[in-house]
From Swiss-Prot:
Its EC number is 2.7.1.23. This is NAD kinase 1. NAD(+) binds at D67, G68, N149, E150, D181, T192, G193, Y194, T195, V196, S197. It is found in: Cytoplasm. Its cofactor is a divalent metal cation. Coiled coil: none annotated. Involved in the regulation of the intracellular balance of NAD and NADP, and is a key enzyme in the biosynthesis of NADP. Catalyzes specifically the phosphorylation on 2'-hydroxyl of the adenosine moiety of NAD to yield NADP. GO terms for cellular component: cytoplasm.
Length: 306
C-alpha cells in the first residue's frame, strides 16, 4: 500500500485517542505522507472537510476510538472505497477495531502497510431512502442514508410511550403488520449489536444477508427473519398522523417519517473496507471475548482436541 495521503480521525474529547493521533501523524509525515487529522463525535464530523480538502486520492483512514467512531467513518468513507484501520483507543467492546495491543509499535504497523502485510475485510452495508405518495407513484423525499450495523424504525414522543404499527413488505409483497416498539433491519456486522440485544440471530460477518428483528412485539408469532442480501425491505408507518416515527442509522438519527411515508432498505452498492492486522483473525474468538462466552474461561487452541 502506498501512503501518500492519510486521514486520521480520533474520538472527540478523548485525550488518549488524541495523543495517539498526534503520534501517528508525526510518524507518517516523517515518511513523506500528507495527513488530514481531526476529531470525530456526535458534534464533530470531519469527513466532509477531509474529502473536500484532499489534494490527492486518500489511501487510508486511521480511526482511533470505539465502534461508534468506526461506524461513522464507514458511512462516510465506504462510497469512496477508502480502507479503514480502526484501533480501539478509548472505546468499549471494539467489535470493529484492532486491539490497541496490535498498535503499540506504530512504526512496525507502517512497515507492514507499506509492504502489503495485512488483510482487507469487506463488509456489507445497507442503504435507506424515504418516499411519499401513492404506492404506484412514489417520490423520494430524502437523501440516501447508509448504515454498516443497522437501520431501526421506532416511534418517537417526548411524553408518551408509543406502540408502533409498522407494515412491512419484502420485494413488493406484504409480509406482516408489526405492533410493538419497532423494527431493526440489520447486516451481519450489526447482528452482534442492537439486534442480538433484541433476541435476534447472530450472523457471521463474512455473510451477505439481511435480518429483520421486531422489538418487543405484542404478538408472540412475530419472529426474526433472515433474508437474501438482494431483498428490498419496505416499511410503512401506520396509525396516528400527529405522531412521528424515527429512522435511525447505526444509532444515529437519520430522519423522521410519518404515515404515508415509505422507507425502502436494501443492500448498499458499496462495502466498508477494513484493514486487518491480526495474523490469526477468528470471528469465533471475537465472539468468545466480546460476548464473554464460556470459551473465554478456557485457554483454547486449535489443537486442543487432537
Amino acid at each position: 500500500m502506498q501512503l501518500k495521503q492519510v486521514i486520521i480521525a480520533y474520538k472527540a474529547r478523548d485525550s488518549q485517542s488524541k495523543r495517539w493521533a498526534e503520534l501517528c501523524a508525526k510518524q507518517l509525515e516523517n515518511r513523506n505522507c500528507q495527513v488530514l487529522m481531526g476529531p470525530s463525535g456526535p458534534k464533530d464530523n470531519p469527513y466532509p472537510v477531509f474529502l473536500a480538502s484532499a489534494s490527492q486520492p486518500i489511501d487510508l483512514a486511521i480511526v482511533l476510538g470505539g465502534d461508534g467512531t468506526v461506524l461513522t467513518s464507514a458511512r462516510h468513507l465506504a462510497p469512496a472505497g477508502i480502507p479503514i484501520l480502526g484501533v480501539n483507543v478509548g472505546g468499549h467492546l471494539g467489535f470493529l477495531t484492532e486491539s490497541v495491543d496490535e498498535f503499540q509499535d506504530t512504526e512496525k504497523v507502517w512497515d507492514r502497510l507499506f509492504e502489503d502485510r495485512y488483510a482487507i475485510q469487506r463488509r456489507m452495508m445497507l442503504q435507506a431512502a424515504v418516499y411519499e405518495g401513492h404506492r404506484t407513484n412514489l417520490e423520494p423525499v430524502t437523501e440516501r442514508y447508509l448504515g454498516l450495523n443497522e437501520f431501526c424504525v421506532k416511534p418517537a414522543s417526548a411524553d408518551r410511550m408509543i406502540t408502533s404499527i409498522l407494515e412491512m413488505e419484502i420485494d413488493g409483497e406484504v409480509v406482516d403488520q408489526y405492533v410493538g416498539d419497532g423494527l431493526i433491519i440489520s447486516t451481519p456486522t450489526g447482528s452482534t449489536g442492537y439486534t442480538v440485544s433484541a433476541s435476534g440471530p447472530i450472523m457471521h460477518d463474512g455473510m451477505e444477508a439481511i435480518t429483520i428483528t421486531p422489538i418487543c412485539p405484542m404478538s408472540l408469532s412475530s419472529r426474526p427473519l433472515i433474508l437474501p442480501a438482494g431483498s428490498v425491505v419496505s416499511i410503512w408507518p401506520l396509525g396516528d398522523y400527529d405522531l412521528s416515527t424515527k429512522l435511525w442509522m447505526d444509532g444515529v438519527l437519520a430522519t423522521s417519517i410519518w404515515p404515508a411515508h415509505r422507507v425502502d432498505i436494501r443492500m448498499a452498492d458499496c462495502r466498508a473496507k477494513f484493514i486487518v492486522l491480526r495474523e490469526n483473525n477468528s470471528y469465533y474468538q471475537t465472539l468468545r471475548e466480546k460476548l464473554l462466552w464460556a470459551g473465554t474461561r478456557v485457554r483454547y487452541t486449535s489443537t486442543q482436541h487432537n
